[in-house]
From Swiss-Prot:
GO cellular component, one term: large ribosomal subunit
Similarity comment text for this entry: Belongs to the universal ribosomal protein uL10 family.
Entry's transmembrane regions: none
InterPro entries reported for this sequence: Ribosomal_uL10, Ribosomal_uL10-like_sf, Ribosomal_uL10_bac, Ribosomal_uL10_bac_type, Ribosomal_uL10_CS_bac
Species per Swiss-Prot/TrEMBL record: Bradyrhizobium sp. (strain ORS 278)
Pfam families: Ribosomal_L10 (PF00466)
Protein name, as recorded: Large ribosomal subunit protein uL10
GO biological process: translation
Keywords tagged on the record: Ribonucleoprotein, Ribosomal protein, RNA-binding, rRNA-binding
Lineage: Bacteria, Pseudomonadati, Pseudomonadota, Alphaproteobacteria, Hyphomicrobiales
GO molecular function: large ribosomal subunit rRNA binding; structural constituent of ribosome
């Protein structure tokens, strides 16, 4: 790789690291090309991305970013999964690691907080931002629906009492 190409690669990686919400580092030694393509496809569907670069260039790109703490994890054949959603990259990485034993998660970073493997697994078990938003909307709508039911209930009761009284009058 020429010096200019290295500089451009570092700049691109730096932009990715600067804007990412979470980064997950894993070893990928022994994975086939098809498996790596599958990982990239799954990450893309989840709104995340996968980067494979020289560790030395990645360490340079990490400088001045929140995720600089993952630098010590960059040893050997590593892949870095990033996403803005704090759950997307960890969730896909954990699922992929379960299916492929050669994909070993080393740790990660969420903002300036360095994560170990257990923390990445815990993060992956959380619901995504979209799921949380859906639940929040449901919780907000539930009281309004209940209030509408309560407001209509007295009128319905009065109607049933009148209907019952009318039924008695016809029976007599």
């Amino acid at each position: 790789m020429e010096r200019a190409a290295k500089k451009e690669a570092v700049e691109q990686l730096h932009e990715v690291f600067k804007t990412t919400g979470v980064a997950v580092v894993a070893h990928y030694s022994g994975l086939t090309v098809a498996q790596m393509q599958n990982l990239r496809k799954q990450m893309k569907q989840a709104g995340a991305s996968v980067k494979v670069s020289k560790n030395r260039l990645a360490k340079i790109a990490l400088e001045g970013t929140d995720v600089v703490g993952i630098g010590p994890l960059l040893k050997g054949p590593t892949v870095i999964a990033t996403s803005n959603d704090p759950v997307a990259a960890p969730k896909v990485a954990i699922e992929f690691a379960k299916a492929n034993e050669k994909f070993v998660i080393l740790g990660g970073s969420m903002g300036s907080t360095v994560l170990n493997v257990d923390s990445v697994k815990a993060l992956a078990s959380l619901p995504s931002l979209d799921e949380l938003r859906g639940k929040l909307v449901g919780l907000i709508q539930a009281p309004a629906t209940k209030l509408a039911q309560l407001a209509n209930a007295p009128a319905a009761k009065v109607a049933r009492v009148i209907q019952a009284h009318a039924s008695k009058g016809e029976a007599a």
